[in-house]
């Protein structure tokens, strides 16, 4: 397709030059023809790269129009390549959000309550946290302290593993089936239309970062050997400590890493990467204000507002709305809340039901929520007034945005 368009472009330019050789009007015609054909080439490329989006989707049209504007050199909205930064939430934005809970929550439950090599060693605290997650899954019980407790339990339950061992553990967990779907494993829940968006951005010289509330190393392990190809330094999440094998509890200020030493998970939870913490980590680790933001909950509101607020460049914030009940674990009340917030804060809504031709990879069939619905509904209850002054409970439970 691109080769054919290139031939077409060359032929059109040749015709315009022959028709107007030596004349200023001919030169203008040539320039106009070139611009028109270049615009057509770009439009066709967008159609190809966003083929899983319905053509009448407003979010798709806005993204394409935006890309045409910011990549036109000399245009008023042109953005230099070094400033083309896009940030994405993970759970519910790029990947199946809950089934019956977040990936990192189900990973902890498996480690503490089911893993035959660890469950007998699990601490009482880890068991308490895992059972809270199970209770939330089955009964929808709210635990406002759960996000921090979960982070602490993950850190302690995997303490002593090397980073590579942790990644390998996650690879095995990814092979387990996703309970509400046929043909999909725990690691296969990527949203295909959003993967196309990332490829489209990369093709237009964007650097893409994942800014997740999920543990940084869990995110990296989940994306390892997956359809989403990003380097680890562009995958940012909640943090836990890392130590040297020979450090023996000594403070890092007093210990020098030795050649040939190994790094291990240190067992200490540091920070949950949600809300304002997302803005802070973007500033600290990227150092450039993003021009595109993609999220799905109020946990991503700060990141969205940071992207479009006081930005010297043209910027947009997109929010996914989980309004599809036929193809995935949709939640209509949550989707409507997000539509309302998008209208209030000038974010662009993405309808999973109406904007996408498909959600998951070929061969995946949604067979029902089973135990997923109570946890998912109770885990996130965005409300308009909570964007500016989020309630403590909502901040706690909106935990993997």
Language-model segment annotations:
Residues 1, 27, 381-382:
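Disordered, low-complexity tails and leader-like regions
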Residues 2-24:
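Sec-dependent N-terminal signal peptides of Gram-positive bacterial secreted proteins and lipoproteins
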Residues 3-4, 11, 53, 156, ...:
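A generic helix-loop boundary/linker signal
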Residues 5, 19, 91, 212, ...:
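Short glycine-rich loop/turn motifs that provide flexible caps or phosphate-binding loops at active sites
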Residues 18-36:
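Sec-dependent signal peptide cleavage junction
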Residues 35-50, 165-209, 213-401:
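C-terminal cap/substrate-recognition subdomain and adjoining C-terminal extension
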Residues 38-251:
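Alpha-helical substrate-recognition element adjacent to the catalytic core
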């Amino acid at each position: 397709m691109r080769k054919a368009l290139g031939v077409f472009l060359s032929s059109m330019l040749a015709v315009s030059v022959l028709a107007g050789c030596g004349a200023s009007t001919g030169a203008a015609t040539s320039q106009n023809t070139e611009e028109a054909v270049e615009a057509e080439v770009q439009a066709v490329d967008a159609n190809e790269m966003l083929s899983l989006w319905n053509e009448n989707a407003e979010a798709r049209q806005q993204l394409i129009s935006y890309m045409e504007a910011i990549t036109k050199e000399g245009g008023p909205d042109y953005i230099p390549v070094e400033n083309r930064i896009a940030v994405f939430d993970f759970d519910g934005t790029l990947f199946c959000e809950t089934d019956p809970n977040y990936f990192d929550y189900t990973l902890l439950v498996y480690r503490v309550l089911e893993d035959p090599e660890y469950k007998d060693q699990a601490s009482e605290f880890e068991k308490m946290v895992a059972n809270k997650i199970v209770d939330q899954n089955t009964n929808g019980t709210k635990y406002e302290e759960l996000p921090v407790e979960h982070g602490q339990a993950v850190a302690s339950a995997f303490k002593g593993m090397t980073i590579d061992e942790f990644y390998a553990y996650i690879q095995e967990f990814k092979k387990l089936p996703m309970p509400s779907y046929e043909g999909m494993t725990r690691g296969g829940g990527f949203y295909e239309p959003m993967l196309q968006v990332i490829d489209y951005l990369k093709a237009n010289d964007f650097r893409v970062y994942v800014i997740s509330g999920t543990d940084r190393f869990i995110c990296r392990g989940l994306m390892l050997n997956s359809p989403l190809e990003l380097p680890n330094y562009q995958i940012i999440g909640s943090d836990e400590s890392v130590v040297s094998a020979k450090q023996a509890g000594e403070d890092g200020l007093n210990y020098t890493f030795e050649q040939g030493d190994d790094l291990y998970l240190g067992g200490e939870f540091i920070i949950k990467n949600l809300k304002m913490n997302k803005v802070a980590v973007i500033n600290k680790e990227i150092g450039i204000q993003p021009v595109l933001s993609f999220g799905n909950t109020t946990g991503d509101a700060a990141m969205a507002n940071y992207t479009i607020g006081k930005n010297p460049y043209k910027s947009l914030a997109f929010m996914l709305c989980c309004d599809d009940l036929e193809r995935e674990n949709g939640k209509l009340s949550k989707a409507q809340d997000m539509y309302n917030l998008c209208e209030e804060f000038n974010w662009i809504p993405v309808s999973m039901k109406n904007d996408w031709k498909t959600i998951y990879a070929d061969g995946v069939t949604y067979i029902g929520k089973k135990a997923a619905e109570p946890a998912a509904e109770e885990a996130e209850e965005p409300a308009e007034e909570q964007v500016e002054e989020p309630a403590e409970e909502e901040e706690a439970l909106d935990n993997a945005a």
